[in-house]
């Protein structure tokens, strides 16, 4: 190829870390873990008005096909082992979004004997979405924040 032909072509220069971060953030497949009224708002996000497909987000029915878990609602003590089991079945790398006051810290039922005071006591949480219940826009903002976090995280570690 002549130098004149190469000058006309457009090249994109980047690092492997930026490329992998872009690919991971652009193809998030969430596993929904709806426990209460926040799950209804999570369903709104999946509808046509917000169109998560444009962000590369497709809800998956199996934890083995997912890389993001959205915990939406009140986590009780009996459900905590199931949450951990589903989290452990997800392949690495995996991320967790805690959606709503109940998932974040127990919410209205904080002092109940049967409620876990935050799902971060069971699984590590990457993004907290506040609200009771949070709006679909708030969850969408949380998903965008998780995408930004994934892009910033180094992929290759020495």
From Swiss-Prot:
Membrane topology: Peripheral membrane protein
Protein's cellular compartments: Cell inner membrane
Chemical reaction(s) catalysed: a quinone + NADH + 5 H(+)(in) = a quinol + NAD(+) + 4 H(+)(out)
Gene3D superfamilies: 3.40.50.12280
Cellular-component GO terms for this entry: plasma membrane; respiratory chain complex I
Signal peptide (from-to): none
GO biological process, one term: aerobic respiration
Domain of life: Bacteria
PROSITE patterns named among the record's database cross-references: COMPLEX1_20K
A Pfam family that the UniProt record links to this protein: Oxidored_q6
Root EC class: translocase
Cofactor: [4Fe-4S] cluster
NADP among keywords: no
GO molecular function, one term: NADH dehydrogenase (ubiquinone) activity
Function, in words: NDH-1 shuttles electrons from NADH, via FMN and iron-sulfur (Fe-S) centers, to quinones in the respiratory chain. Couples the redox reaction to proton translocation (for every two electrons transferred, four hydrogen ions are translocated across the cytoplasmic membrane), and thus conserves the redox energy in a proton gradient.
Protein name: NADH-quinone oxidoreductase subunit B
Gene: nuoB
């Amino acid at each position: 190829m002549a130098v004149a032909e190469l000058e006309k072509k457009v090249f994109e220069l980047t690092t492997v870390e930026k490329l992998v971060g872009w690919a991971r953030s652009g193809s998030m497949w969430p596993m929904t873990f709806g426990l209460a009224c926040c799950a209804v708002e999570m369903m709104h996000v999946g509808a046509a008005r917000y169109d998560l497909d444009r962000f590369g987000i497709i809800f998956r029915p199996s934890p083995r096909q997912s890389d993001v878990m959205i915990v939406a609602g009140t986590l009780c003590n009996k459900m905590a082992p199931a949450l951990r089991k589903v989290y452990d079945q997800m392949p690495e790398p995996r991320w967790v979004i805690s959606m709503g006051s109940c998932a974040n810290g127990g919410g209205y039922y904080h002092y109940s004997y049967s409620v876990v005071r935050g799902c971060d006591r069971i699984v590590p949480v990457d993004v907290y979405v506040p609200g009771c219940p949070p709006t679909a826009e708030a969850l969408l903002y949380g998903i965008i924040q998780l995408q930004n976090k994934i892009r910033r995280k180094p992929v290759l570690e020495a």
